[in-house]
Regions:
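Glycan-processing catalytic domains of CAZymes
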Residues: 19-187
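Bacterial N-terminal signal peptides
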Residues: 1-8
Length: 187
């Protein structure tokens, strides 16, 4: 009887002024408003998002995905990479395309839908070769510079472009390594 009375009291009582106006824990929760786009997905362990199980270069798939992300409130998109293993996901003149030549590139599909939805995109400038790009290698460094110029020419004035992302990351252990700083500054 006591438990029943307490539950009835708890359910029928009005919230206090503090309960209705002050939610310190929920005030700290911020929505996710950005996400990564990973066209060159390498992790074959994940059977649901592994490109072996669907056409990861389909422009309609990416247009729909950007539409969905926009509806969820996502404002920022960051391309992880726009090329991998010397194949591009954009109309490159430097390398073979990773998508059929008779259709729109995945990068163009994403950029155009993002512009339509007023989203902001950080364009990746890699990978010159693959995810292990070593910018100390003169050939990879030159390829990276060529890609950066090509991407700037193709997308530098695109309405969805918000910034650039160099996907050659290094450890902050506790500081960036000297070769990482030198490589980025050289680019």
């Amino acid at each position: 009887i006591a438990i029943s009375a307490l539950s009835q009291l708890a359910c029928s009582s009005s919230p206090t002024a503090q309960e209705t106006t002050n939610h310190p824990q929920t005030d700290l929760v911020k929505p996710i408003n950005g996400t990564w786009i990973n066209l060159a997905y390498q992790d074959v362990r994940n059977k649901y998002t592994n490109p072996q199980h669907f056409d990861n270069t389909d422009p309609h798939l990416w247009s729909q995905k950007v539409e969905e992300l926009s509806q969820m409130g996502v404002e920022y998109l960051v391309f992880m990479a726009v090329a991998n293993e010397e194949k591009s996901f954009y109309p490159s003149k430097l390398m073979t395309w990773a998508y059929p030549a008779n259709r729109k590139s995945p990068v163009d599909a994403i950029m155009d839908k993002a512009a339509e939805k007023k989203m902001k995109v950080f364009m990746s400038t890699g990978w010159a070769k693959d995810q292990d790009d070593n910018l100390r290698d003169p050939e990879i460094k030159q390829r990276q510079l060529d890609m950066m110029k090509e991407l700037a020419n193709l997308y530098g004035n695109h309405p969805a472009l918000y910034g650039w992302y160099l996907p050659v990351e290094d450890c902050l252990c506790p500081l960036l390594s000297e070769h990482a700083v030198v490589s980025v500054n050289a680019l």
